[in-house]
């Protein structure tokens, strides 16, 4: 995917780019990317459905276009229904990241969002949270092998586990 044309010069407080995407929740669509300030990137995704353009999902962060982690959004059919979900990685101001998954809900004509449920994904790691004095949690998606790494930062060190990203480790689906 090539980036679209940027609107705004190098010193602009905000830059905007519009990029066509072949697969947004199984539909053609586009990504509206804005760089806010000097480092914060926000990407909103829209799918061209039977109802017209519909909001599909979002990713935001400080380290997009990172060679190791990618651009923050990946289409992949996680549910096995033949339609791709949109997997996104958002990085927050404290440096911690979270993985969100968006899917198309045909009955409601819109997207739904879910995220990794730590209790489902790794009950042992989730149980360590309280006794170890957790200072932060992070999730990193690895598109090359469709895995997610859960990292628990504690007062006594870092604990992490990597497992396949499947619908079995996701929480409830909610409408944006």
Where are each of the predicted segments found?
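Short N-terminal edge-element motif at the start of the domain
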Residues: 1-24, 61-64
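Acidic, divalent-cation-chelating loop motifs in proteins
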Residues: 15-31, 75-81
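Acidic, small-residue rich beta-repeat scaffolds with periodic aromatic anchors
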Residues: 35-176
């Amino acid at each position: 995917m090539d980036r679209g044309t940027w609107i705004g010069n190098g010193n602009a407080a905000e830059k905007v780019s519009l990029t066509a995407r072949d697969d947004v929740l199984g539909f053609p669509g586009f990504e509206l990317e804005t760089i806010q300030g000097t480092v914060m990137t926000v990407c909103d995704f829209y799918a061209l459905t039977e109802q017209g353009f519909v909001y599909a999902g979002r990713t935001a962060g400080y380290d997009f276009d990172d060679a190791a982690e990618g651009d923050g959004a990946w289409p992949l059919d996680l549910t096995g229904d033949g339609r791709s979900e949109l997997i996104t990685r958002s990085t927050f101001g404290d440096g911690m990241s979270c993985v969100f998954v968006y899917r198309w809900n045909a009955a409601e004509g819109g997207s739904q969002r879910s995220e990794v449920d730590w209790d489902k994904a790794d009950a042992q790691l989730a149980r360590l949270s309280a006794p170890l004095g957790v200072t932060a949690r992070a999730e990193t998606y690895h598109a090359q092998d469709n895995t997610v790494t859960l990292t628990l930062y504690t007062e006594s060190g870092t604990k992490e586990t990597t497992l396949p990203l499947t619908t079995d480790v996701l929480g409830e689906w909610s409408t944006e």
